[in-house]
Each structure stands twice: as C-alpha cells, then as structure tokens.
Curated annotation (Swiss-Prot):
Sequence similarity: Belongs to the GTP cyclohydrolase I family.
Pfam name, any one: GTP_cyclohydroI
Enzyme nomenclature, EC number: 3.5.4.16
InterPro entries reported in the protein's UniProt record: GTP-CH-I_C/QueF, GTP-CH-I_N, GTP_CycHdrlase_I, GTP_CycHdrlase_I_CS, GTP_CycHdrlase_I_dom
Protein name: GTP cyclohydrolase 1
Native source species: Pectobacterium carotovorum subsp. carotovorum (strain PC1)
Alphabetic keyword roster: GTP-binding, Hydrolase, Metal-binding, Nucleotide-binding, One-carbon metabolism, Zinc
Assembly and binders: Homomer.
Phylogenetic placement of the source organism: Bacteria, Pseudomonadati, Pseudomonadota, Gammaproteobacteria, Enterobacterales
Length: 220
C-alpha cells in the first residue's frame, strides 16, 4: 500500500483493526488484467446461459461488464481510488453538529450482486479539523462502490470519518431499497431498510442523538 495516500492507508488499517474491512483475498491484480479475466469469465457465464454472443447486441457485453465492475460499481475495492481528503483546521472553533442529508448512494448486494439504492445522512461534531462537505459524499460513494451489506457499509463510513476527523463524534444513517428483496425472492417492492451507526456523543448523549435522528426523519 506504499503508493496509496496517507488517508487511504489510515482508513484501511482502522477498518482492519475493527474487523470491518470488506473480505478481500489479498493484493489486487492490475486494472487491465482484472478487466480481461472478468470478461473471459463473463463470456463463459453467458455461453452457459445459451446466449448468442455473435449477436451484435450481446457481443460486447462481457467487456462492458468487466469495465463497469472495475472502473465503476466495484471501484471502491481499490484504495487507489480513495478520494483525496484535506482536513481543514477548525479556526472558527465550530463545535455544533454538521449534518449532510440526502446523500444518494448506489451499491451492490454481496449476496446476489444486485442493486442497493438509497440515501445516507452523515453528521459530525468538529474537533480540531473540518472536512469539505463534498468529501462526505465522496466517502459514502467510495464505500458504496463495493459488494456490500448495508450494516457494514454504515459502519465503514462511520469509522472512516472518525479516523480522518480525529473524533468519535460521528453518526451515519442509511435508508435503502434492496433489489435482492424487490426484484427476486419475496419480491417486496415497497420495503426499505434503515441502518444507523453512532459514535461518541451521538451514542452517549440523548440530546445529541435525538438531534441527529430528527435530521434523519426530516429527509424521510
């Protein structure tokens, strides 16, 4: 991980220490090799489904899927893609809650590889540093771009922000629709799943917790 940013390494190590890192076998192959091998295996899967890859509509599908997996929907498996983060000195001594609501996210269920579609609310109480608001969105997006379970995703975002901001006072809530429930199995088109992860004052102070939960309910 020597070529990765300091922030990426810090977050990865913090997740490993807490048993919250996404299960990985080891070092990733280079990007082009991953695409090539995924395309080869996807070709075999499509052949097993008796799809005719000589058809012009299907011919490039294995390559498209490989590119989508590596460059887009699973790009968060590679810490080389971790967003560039700058923590700004808290010169204004902000000590009240900073909340960003309605952060859209699209992830992939690791059990069936179908879509998770939702929104996140993220809050923190600054200590020595503050973070650009768009970076909160980017961190949510980074961890969403992996095969995921919603509970782990929520905690990964929490620990990443705690690590970067140097404070436990972080809270994350995600409300999402799982297409493994909506599009298959029970085929429930209306249910949604909410997960919440609280740290520091958000867990120990009832008033702080309630202020955050009111913000969550506001966007719902």
């Amino acid at each position: 991980m020597s070529s990765l940013s300091k922030e990426a390494v810090m977050v990865h190590e913090a997740l490993l220490a807490r048993g919250l890192e996404t299960p990985l076998r080891g070092a990733l192959l280079d990007r082009d090799t991953r695409k090539q091998r995924i395309a080869e295996h996807m070709t075999e899967i499509m052949n097993l489904l008796s799809l005719d890859l000589s058809d012009d509509s299907l011919a490039e599908t294995p390559t498209r899927i490989a590119k989508m997996y590596v460059d887009e929907i699973f790009s968060g498996l590679d810490y080389a893609n971790f967003p560039k983060i700058t923590i700004i000195e808290n010169k204004m001594k902000v000590d009240e809650m900073v909340t960003v609501r309605d952060i859209t996210l699209t992830s992939t269920c690791e059990h069936h590889f179908v879509t998770i579609d939702g929104k996140a609310t993220v809050a923190y109480i600054p200590k020595d540093g503050v973070i650009g608001l768009s970076k909160l969105n980017r961190i949510v997006q980074f961890f969403s771009q992996r095969p995921q379970v919603q509970e782990r995703l929520t905690q990964q975002i929490l620990v990443a922000l705690q690590t970067l901001l140097g404070t436990n006072n972080v809270a994350v809530s995600i409300d999402a629709v799982h297409y493994c429930v909506k599009a298959r199995g029970i085929r429930d088109a209306t249910s949604a799943t909410t997960t919440t992860s609280l740290g520091g004052l958000f867990k120990s102070s009832q008033n702080t917790r309630q202020e955050f939960l009111r913000a969550v309910r506001h966007h719902n």
